[in-house]
Regions:
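Active-site-facing substrate-recognition patch
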Residues: 1-63
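PRPP-dependent phosphoribosyltransferase catalytic core
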Residues: 2-7, 11, 141-192
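Glycine-/small-residue-rich active-site loops that bind phosphorylated ligands and cofactors
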Residues: 42, 72-73, 134, 163
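Short, well-ordered alpha-helices that flank and scaffold nucleotide-derived cofactor binding pockets
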Residues: 56, 82, 86, 144, ...
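Short glycine-rich phosphate-binding loop at a beta-alpha junction
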Residues: 62-73
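Conserved acidic residues
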Residues: 65, 124, 154
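Hydrophobic Val/Ile/Leu positions in short beta-strands of Rossmann-like dinucleotide-binding domains
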Residues: 69, 128-129
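Short, glycine/charge-rich flexible loops or terminal/linker lids adjacent to PRPP-binding catalytic cores
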Residues: 74-127, 134-137
């Protein structure tokens, strides 16, 4: 069994991820660690705490109508929507409905929204919530999908991000490479 280290969030010590050191290849990048964020995505308390950190970047400045969830981030997305819509006289979204949706992959590997969800994206201010951002390719695909369906991207939120921006859009994350000793990521052709 591989050894892991637990990494606690600087903003909330109740939030933690497990990092396994090794050489891990994805379709888009090679990484020095595998980050297990399963508990944060599926455990009630951790998902709620994660949303509590991420909401601070958007609640007072950005109107969000829809949260597009990627990579199994729907539980966090639901708590995030609740925090955004909470009755707070300073919140831009106070008392508003916030949709939480997930695109699907079609038979060609393209991200799509089914007809019954397009109205929740078209003409809406959208926050992209993604579990991890390493190279930014999955985020770019989601951004293209949001744009195709007429949504207006307001930001990107992530549990972990190895990069600060995707195509000039800031990525607000709970964890970054600075939190994980020795973390490195590289594009496939640049792998050492």
């Amino acid at each position: 069994m591989m050894s892991s280290m637990r990494i606690k969030s600087r903003e909330n010590p109740n939030l933690e991820i497990s990092a396994f050191r090794g050489h891990f290849a994805t379709r888009h990048s090679h990484n020095s660690h595998y980050l297990d964020i399963t508990r944060m995505k599926h455990e009630y308390g951790m998902a709620a705490d994660a949303a509590g950190i991420l909401v601070q970047h958007y609640i007072y400045e950005k109107q969000i109508d829809t949260i597009v969830c990627m990579d199994g981030s729907e539980v966090i997305g639901t708590f995030l929507a609740g925090r955004l819509a909470k009755n707070d006289r300073f919140s831009v979204n106070s008392g508003r409905n916030v949709y939480v949706v997930t695109p699907e992959y079609d038979s060609n590997g393209q991200l799509i929204f089914r007809d019954n969800l397009t109205g929740m994206v078209s003409g809406k201010n959208v926050l992209l919530l993604i579990s991890t951002v390493n190279s930014g390719k999955t985020a770019r695909r989601a951004m293209e999908c949001i744009e195709y369906y007429g949504g207006s991207l307001q930001g990107i939120a992530a549990v972990f991000s190895a990069i600060a921006k995707v195509d000039e859009v800031p990525v607000m994350s709970i964890f970054s490479p600075e939190d994980i000793p020795g973390y490195m990521t590289s594009l496939v052709p640049d792998c050492p």
